[in-house]
Design a protein with these regions (language model features):
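Short beta-rich binding modules
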Residues: 1-101
Length: 101
């Protein structure tokens, strides 16, 4: 498998499916444009985004937000279900995690 990139007008969303494509810290910082924030999903996948993206008023990332809201639903979580992702984001699939695990 190879990594999949989805480009939008507002931001980028990259899905990493292979360990050889997993970014290191510097690569992740460059992609998201600053300090990184990592969130582990219940299924073991890991999302990396810009920690200060909302403060920087980065544009909404619709693909990452849709994935977030499909995962963290109101019926299962007390908080975070209505949150959103801004700026570039990387989703590292569970089988591709090495450095970030």
């Amino acid at each position: 498998m190879t990594n999949t990139e989805i480009n939008t007008k507002t931001s980028e969303f990259k899905i990493i499916e292979n360990q050889k494509d997993e970014p290191d810290l510097k690569q992740a910082q460059k992609f998201v444009g600053g300090m990184v924030q990592g969130i582990e999903f219940p299924n073991g996948d890991y999302m990396i985004m810009n920690e200060e993206g909302k403060l920087m008023q980065l544009p909404l990332n619709p693909e990452a937000t849709a994935l977030w809201r499909a995962t963290f639903t109101k019926d299962k979580y007390l908080f975070g279900y209505d949150d959103f992702v801004v700026g570039p984001a990387i989703l590292i699939k569970k089988q591709a995690l090495k450095r970030w695990a």
